[in-house]
Amino acid sequence: MAEHGLKIAVVGPQRTGKTLLCRALAEQPILLGEMSYQPTAAVRIQEISRVLGIDRVKVQFWDVSGSVQYQSYWPVLAKEVDGLLMVIDPNRPEQERDLETFYRNFAEPNNLYTRQCMVMAIQVQKEGGGLGGWQGLQGGLKKLSQSYVAINPANPAAGVQEAYSHLDVLFQGALQSKKEALESSYMNQEDQ
C-alpha cells in the first residue's frame, strides 16, 4: 500500500466550527460549556490517517485562525497546501465574501484545481437540534464542491462520519493532483 501525505488548510471566518471539526476528525477531546470556544492563535495542526483505495494517506489539517489579526501569516501557512477546506456558518450566508478572500490567499497561490477545494457549512448543534437549511453558495465560489454537516460537540461521531463522506472526495482530488504533479516533474527530469 502506497503512503502519501497531504496538507489541507482549513480556513474560514471566526466561530464557524473549524477547530471543532478538526478536533472531532482527529478524535481529540472537545471542550464543552463556557470554555467551548477558544479562538485559534494563528494555526493548530491535527493529523489523521485515511485509506483511499490502495493509498494510505496521512492528512494534516492546518486549522487557520479566521481572525484578521493573523492575516499577515497566511502566505506562510498557505505554502505548499495540497487542498483547501473552507468552512462557513450556514446561518450566516454573508460569510461567503470572506471565503472568497481565503480562496484568493490559499488556493490561488498554490494553483489549486476545483477538485482540491471544498466548502463545508458546519451547523454546531446541541442534543435534539435540527439541521436547518442551507441554500449553498451563491457567488463566485459556487463552482466548488459544497457540503453541509451538523456536529453535536457532546456526541460528534455522527457528524464526523458525515464529514468524512464529503472529505474523502476532497482528499482524493488533492491526492490525484499531487500524484500528477510528481509524475510531471519526473517526466521533465527525463527530458533534460
UniProtKB/Swiss-Prot annotation:
Protein name: Intraflagellar transport protein 22
Keyword hit for Protein transport: no
Oligomer status and interactors: Component of the IFT complex B, composed of IFT88, IFT70, IFT52, IFT46, IFT27, IFT25 and IFT22.
Main location: other
Family as reported in the entry's similarity comment: Belongs to the small GTPase superfamily. Rab family.
Keyword list, A-Z: Cell projection, Cilium, Flagellum, GTP-binding, Nucleotide-binding
Origin species: Chlamydomonas reinhardtii
Role played: Component of the intraflagellar transport (IFT) complex B. Functions in regulating the cellular pool size of both complex A and complex B and thus plays a critical role in determining the cellular availability of IFT particles.
